[in-house]
Amino acid sequence: MIKKLFQKLLLKSGKSYTLDSNIPTSLIVQILFKRFIMLLRGYLKTHKRVFLDRNCILLNKKNIKFGKNVTIEHNVKIDGFCKETIQFGNNSKIGAYSWISCTSHLSKFGVGFKIGNNSGVGKFTEFGASGGIEIGNDVIMGSYISFHSENHNFNDNSKLIREQGVTSIGIKIGNNVWVGAKVTFLDGCAIGNNCVVAAGAVVKDIFPDNVIIGGIPAKILKEIK
């Protein structure tokens, strides 16, 4: 009975997969209890239907907009001090120990961060969103991924690099993208729709739809037909 109820809850929340028959009922009860506590904590802190785990920090909450059924795992920090509204799409997820940093220095007010519907990132992901990060719908990502949406200027030999300021273009990822673990995204890069990014890649360029990319720096390895 509990399994059937859990399956109905999955379908209602937009999850299309079928529950494995080998999953014990005790695990389902444990998950339901944890999700209930997270939902209660999220509602008390945001007044929205957000599943918020323990030890999370939300800075400038009024500039953070949550869709339905957003999950923020434990020990996540979200910096809402930025020019644009931080947006989390429906059923999106941020893995534990991740950090969204929008304004890292008082010399530049950051742009912001957006993630679409049904998109999720794994644990220990760093979003340097001062130059802006946009992630589309149905994007799945592994752990230990980093985004760096600005670059330090270094062309003036008469000044220290740290005194030359920064430039930023932003980072964009399309819809239906799979990103492997430990990928690094550099400022100005963009990934098209229906793409795969191999684990460990360093992405600095703009890539079209329907490709598999990988390597340092990342290059097109194969087209998806």
Label each residue range with its predicted role.
Residues 45, 50-51, 72, 82, ...:
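Extended beta-solenoid/beta-helix repeat architectures
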Residues 62, 84, 131, 209, ...:
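A generic "binding-loop/recognition-motif" signal
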Residues 1-49, 138, 144-145, 149-159, ...:
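Terminal amphipathic alpha-helical/low-complexity segments used for targeting or macromolecular assembly
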Residues 72-187, 224-225:
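Flexible, glycine/small-residue-enriched loop-and-beta-strand segment within the central core
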Residues 190-214, 218:
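C-terminal/domain-terminus segments
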Residues 1-16, 59-62, 68-80:
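N-terminal capping/interface segment
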